[in-house]
């Protein structure tokens, strides 16, 4: 299996895309470390019940001290980190326009969706430099690539993710580290639990493939970009949007 002996750190692994990526990498041999502000017991069960290897820890990605603590623990236990997947993310819980958005909500979205990605790279990259190997995957969004309504803070954060992905990839390419991001369309995760059937149909129709994406759709792309085979790909943001960006 292509990830045998790999240690993969995945944030936002409690549910949705993070859970899907954790399951996929574990199914191909990685030992997956699932990090989330919520408990990841379900993800752990899904992985270990099918023969995979995983562990979990509760961590707030917006706290640099917690990143340092977890990375130190992981390196002391396993000796190396091969893959970092920064997947934890949120959308605003209030109106998300330039006029109506509250400052506290801006800070929350930017903190989790952008600063959390930076903190992950900041704390993990040094060990990858030492090993001269690393694969980093960040989750951006279609909202980073085109204007979508009521996503002011979210699009700012995800646009920032594409920028720091490109910048960090340039800085660390000579160290054997690749850094890429995926820009999903609308993915059927618990974040959509409260939408109406009408909204679900509207989101589905926006994709050329005419359905919502699934965490598995993103996980397949994530697995390739974090694999040894993707050694000549870095600094890129890849849409995984069912053709939405072509319309």
Q: Where in this protein do the model-derived segments appear?
A:
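Conserved glycine-rich Rossmann-like NAD(P)H-binding loop of the short-chain dehydrogenase/reductase
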Residues: 28-42
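Substrate-binding pocket helix/loop in short-chain dehydrogenase/reductase
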Residues: 94-98, 102-110, 192, 199, ...
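Catalytic Tyr-X3-Lys loop
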Residues: 99-118, 133-137, 161, 209
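Active-site helix of classical SDR
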Residues: 121, 157, 165
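Conserved glycine-rich cofactor-binding loop
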Residues: 14-15
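Alpha-helical segment proximal to the catalytic Tyr-Lys
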Residues: 126, 170-174, 231
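Short C-terminal tail/terminal secondary-structure segment
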Residues: 95, 146, 206, 223, ...
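Residue(s) in the substrate-gating loop at a strand-loop-helix junction
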Residues: 141
């Amino acid at each position: 299996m292509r990830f045998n002996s790999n240690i993969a750190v995945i944030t936002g692994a409690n549910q949705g895309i993070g859970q899907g990526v954790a399951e996929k990498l574990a199914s191909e041999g990685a030992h997956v470390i699932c990090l989330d502000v919520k408990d990841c017991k379900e993800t752990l069960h899904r992985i270990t019940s099918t023969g995979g290897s995983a562990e979990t820890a509760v961590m707030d990605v917006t706290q640099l001290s917690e990143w340092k603590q977890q990375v130190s623990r992981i390196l002391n236990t396993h000796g190396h980190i091969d893959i970092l997947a920064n997947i934890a993310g949120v959308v605003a819980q209030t109106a998300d326009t330039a006029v109506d958005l509250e400052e506290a909500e801006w800070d929350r979205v930017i903190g989790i969706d952008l600063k959390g990605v930076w903190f992950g790279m900041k704390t993990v990259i040094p060990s990858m430099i030492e090993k001269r190997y690393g694969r980093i995957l960040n989750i951006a969004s279609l909202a980073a690539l085109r204007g979508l309504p009521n996503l002011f803070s979210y699009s700012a954060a995800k646009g920032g993710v594409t920028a720091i992905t490109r910048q960090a990839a340039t800085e660390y390419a000579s160290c054997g580290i690749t850094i890429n991001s995926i820009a999903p369309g609308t993915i059927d995760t618990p974040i959509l639990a409260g939408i109406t059937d009408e909204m679900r149909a509207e989101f589905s129709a926006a994709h050329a493939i005419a359905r919502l994406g699934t965490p598995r759709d993103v996980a397949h792309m994530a697995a390739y970009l974090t694999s040894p085979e993707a050694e000549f790909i870095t600094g890129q943001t890849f849409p995984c949007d069912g053709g939405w960006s072509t319309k």
